[in-house]
């Protein structure tokens, strides 16, 4: 795909630490991912990056150099802990917000969104914060967690694409993730957004404090 011929709004790259050619450190000390993200940025894309927990690797040399070319970074508490070298409490909103702010300070341009099974927080370079608890799904509805992080990201990006507030974007994300939990596959549980949001209305949300 030739980026210069693409007129989409967002450039989504997933996942760092799982893309051998893009994770490779080049002769100039930069990674292929940073070079690609810089090109996307120069063409006017809003760059979005997601990390992966299955391959916790060399964050300092692979992830950190790319962050100044990232507009929005998604990660969970395990990835954030690996990136910062610090323990993060997944159900403590202050722990999540502080970690997200620390990662933002590493160079992310716009938003860091940190999510866990308890909910999600967002911090921005403009000083905005948003917090949203996850949907209180009953145990009998949960068939598997595979793909829930991807569903969360998709819900958030849909909200951003339709110019929703970040609080609303996080709500769309956690509701999309909740629907994903209802099937053991990575995507068959995901419904259209109205039905996803109905899960939040039906079961309520955790209080993330």
What are these regions (language model features)?
Residues 1-72, 78-130, 135, 186-209:
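Ribokinase/PfkB-type carbohydrate-kinase core domain
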Residues 106-108, 136-209:
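Conserved post-catalytic alpha-helical subdomain immediately downstream of the catalytic base
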Residues 77-78, 150:
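Alpha-helix N-cap/helix-start capping motif
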């Amino acid at each position: 795909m030739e980026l210069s011929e693409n007129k989409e709004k967002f450039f989504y790259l997933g996942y760092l630490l799982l893309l051998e050619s893009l994770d490779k450190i080049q002769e100039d000390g930069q990674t292929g991912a940073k070079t690609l993200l810089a090109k996307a940025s120069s063409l006017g894309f809003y760059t979005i990056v997601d990390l992966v927990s299955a391959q916790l690797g060399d964050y300092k040399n692979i992830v950190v150099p790319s962050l100044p070319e990232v507009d929005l970074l998604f990660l969970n508490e395990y990835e954030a802990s690996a990136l910062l070298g610090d323990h993060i409490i997944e159900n403590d909103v202050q722990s999540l917000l502080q970690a997200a702010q620390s990662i933002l300070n590493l160079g992310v341009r716009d938003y860091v969104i940190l999510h866990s099974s308890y909910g999600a927080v967002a911090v921005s370079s403009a000083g905005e914060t948003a917090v949203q608890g996850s949907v209180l799904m009953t145990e009998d509805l949960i068939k598997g967690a595979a793909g829930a992080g991807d569903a969360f990201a998709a819900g958030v990006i849909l909200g951003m694409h339709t110019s929703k507030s970040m609080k609303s974007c996080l709500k769309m994300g956690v509701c999309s993730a909740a629907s994903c939990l209802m099937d053991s596959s990575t995507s068959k549980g995901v419904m259209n957004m109205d039905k996803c949001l109905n899960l939040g209305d039906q079961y309520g949300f955790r209080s993330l404090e």
